[in-house]
Amino acid sequence: MHHVYVIECSDGTYYTGYTTDVQRRVAEHNAGDGAKYTRGRTPVTLRHTESFDSKSEAMRREYRIKQLSRAQKEALF
């Protein structure tokens, strides 16, 4: 399974990413081993996930979510 996730950073911003293991990836973000964007913004909280059968579907959805406004992202959860 391939997943797209949205996490909320400690400063209130949102980060959207792709992974095959959501819990592991959130733990990596919280440990400071995630994306450069989240390293100074821990702890992070998981807000939204979507699952897909293919990596390409998940990556397309990740791109679409990243294009959304903050209000549109909040409407997801």
From Swiss-Prot:
It holds the Pfam family GIY-YIG. Residues 1-75 form the GIY-YIG domain. Belongs to the UPF0213 family. PANTHER family: UPF0213 PROTEIN YHBQ. This is UPF0213 protein VNG_2274C. It comes from Halobacterium salinarum (strain ATCC 700922 / JCM 11081 / NRC-1).
